[in-house]
Amino acid sequence: VDWKKIGQHILSVL
């Protein structure tokens, strides 16, 4: 699981 990509996606959604 690419947590860094997921983190960036979450920040993008917020």
UniProtKB/Swiss-Prot annotation:
Compartments, record wording: Secreted
The keyword Secreted appears for this protein: yes
Keywords: Amidation, G-protein coupled receptor impairing toxin, Mast cell degranulation, Secreted, Toxin
Transmembrane segments: none
Tissue-wise expression: Expressed by the venom gland.
Principal subcellular localization: secreted
GO-annotated molecular function: toxin activity
Keyword Secreted among UniProt keywords: yes
Cellular component per GO, a single term: extracellular region
Leucine amide: residues carrying this PTM: 14
Family: Belongs to the MCD family. Mastoparan subfamily.
Role played: Mast cell degranulating peptide. Its mast cell degranulation activity may be related to the activation of G-protein coupled receptors in mast cells as well as interaction with other proteins located in cell endosomal membranes in the mast cells.
Designated name of the protein: Mastoparan-J
